[in-house]
Amino acid sequence: IACNAFIMLVSLCFSRRVVGAKRFDAMKPHERTTWHTNLCTFWPAFAVTAYALPAIATFSGKSDSFVSDVSALTSKACGLSIGYMTWDLGVILARWDDQVVAYGGKGALYLFIVHHVFSIVLWPYALMRHLCAYHINYFLVSEVTNFNMSLRWILAALNMSNTKLY
């Protein structure tokens, strides 16, 4: 949560200068909010994966068993991911109207909330009981896809959808 707060603060202070005042000011208010929150998705995309991927590679249990030891790498990846999801859930609830627009409606937003709440509650419970560590790592590795989605949104918001990077 602290990393997200720091990134949000840096984004609030410097995004307009880095992107350019004209381009940044052309965004709608809900787009500016989404801009800052999307920047917060980059660090967990890589930090969580940096812990979860080696946890999969070094997993010593049986991949078809639900019971296994939980590595320190899995615990760290889970903690980082839960911290990020808690932050994201807080942003969704605090900026509800902006987020409804950003997610394309309440239905998609409710689905996202359910995903976050289930993960926040069930992953730590399962890991504390030595359940599904191998499988949870696969969900944690999927966090890396946030990078692509957020980068695509940022490029579209900057009217850069005709670039090779997009």
Residue ranges, per PLM feature:
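Membrane-helix and juxtamembrane interface regions of eukaryotic multi-pass membrane proteins
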Residues: 1-142, 146-149, 153-166
